[in-house]
Amino acid sequence: IPSSWTSFEQVDEDQWALVRNLRDDVNQMLEIARNDKLVGASLDAAAFVHVPDEATRTILDKLDGDRDLVSPPVKTNGVDDLRTSLMLSQVNLVNSEDAVSEACEAIYVSKGEKSGCTVGVRQAEGSKCGRCWFYDEKVGKLGLPHADLCQRCDDAIFSWEKATGNKFSKEEEKVEEPVP
């Protein structure tokens, strides 16, 4: 195994330790929201996060992806986004604890014990993509060939159709009833 696969710069280790801690704090709030039937799956949720210091904010800003699910991604590589790492449809880094409280009901807001961030959760905005299940505010609004998909998934389906010559269909093959 190449050493580049098994050893990382300290900044990477610190970054992912922070993300894991933030994920733990978000998951605590998600459990409360699930118990109250505010959300079901984690992709039904959006998180609002206030970061207490500049060093932490700098790390999280690097992972803050595009607001919409676009292809190709603009702000990050599209894989290591906070939303993907936290398994949420949306993550909003905000500038104050008050902004978290304004966006989320008080019962779903907490000062994270592990990350030190103030974290709140609420129902994600937009519609659920029929392929990736992330919520996106532009699903069904862009006039795409597959109206129930986000732009990123529509692009993936288009690429697949182009490469294979097949047409994507969500409808299952209809099995005809045998004639008696």
How should these model regions be labeled?
Residues 1-29, 33-64, 83-86, 103-108, ...:
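Acidic, turn-prone loop/beta-hairpin segments
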Residues 67-94:
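A glycine-rich helix N-cap at a beta->alpha junction
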Residues 124-127, 144-145:
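Flanking scaffold residues of small Cys/His-coordinated metal-binding clusters
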Residues 129, 150-153:
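Short cysteine-rich clusters marking metal-coordination/redox-active sites
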Residues 133-136, 154:
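Cys/His-coordinated zinc-binding microdomains
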Residues 138-148:
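Short linker/helix segments within small regulatory modules
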Residues 156-170:
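Short metal-binding segments enriched for Cys and/or His
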Residues 166-180:
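Eukaryotic N-terminal low-complexity, Ser/Thr- and Lys/Arg-rich leader segments
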